[in-house]
């Protein structure tokens, strides 16, 4: 299978995984990106089985609404049964790099509110060590240059993602050249830099389950310590 077919297979597997959890009052958290978009399309076939969704981006919200799935503001919701989203990289502990679509802050917030984080990805995203994919860092615009200098001190090579403004009105620095052997520690350290909103490491709150699309079928993986 090509990459698109792998993504479609894992999106359908995610729907199959979620279906037993759905009740009439269930609200799901739904992420952003190409694999999440395929999940939304597949989930729409079952929109009568649950109440609605909270989206981590304006783009996903528009897609959900286009399918007739009610979209709620997170402040209106007490509980999310699950959050389903893709990843740019994943390791054996199900620690992730996310944010290629610039929605990392909202993704991290919605993840924190969910009972379960279900990550969906194709096998090209499975890595032994995080960092080959540039690590996105969302920054307040006035702090961009300062944060970039601090990231250089940490061993990275930050690059301003020109033409990209997040849904929150901020900028993205993509940090190249990192081999991230201690993801949780680096996530915390970067978030301590004044001007950083958050970064794309999901290590302090990793995925609970990873549905990984491979040529041998979709594998269901859990964190390995």
UniProtKB/Swiss-Prot annotation:
GO terms for biological process: D-ribose metabolic process; pentose-phosphate shunt, non-oxidative branch. It catalyses: aldehydo-D-ribose 5-phosphate = D-ribulose 5-phosphate. Gene3D superfamilies: 3.30.70.260, 3.40.50.1360. Its EC number is 5.3.1.6. Pathway: Carbohydrate degradation; pentose phosphate pathway; D-ribose 5-phosphate from D-ribulose 5-phosphate (non-oxidative stage): step 1/1. It comes from the Bacteria. GO terms for molecular function: ribose-5-phosphate isomerase activity. The active site is at residue 107. GO terms for cellular component: cytosol. Pfam families: Rib_5-P_isom_A (PF06026). The keyword Isomerase applies. Substrate binds at residues 32-35, 85-88, 98-101, 125. Keywords: Isomerase. The keyword DNA damage does not apply. It is an enzyme of class 5 (isomerase). NCBIfam families: PRK00702.1 (NF001924), rpiA (TIGR00021). Homodimer. PANTHER family: RIBOSE-5-PHOSPHATE ISOMERASE. Catalyzes the reversible conversion of ribose-5-phosphate to ribulose 5-phosphate. Belongs to the ribose 5-phosphate isomerase family. This is Ribose-5-phosphate isomerase A. The gene is rpiA.
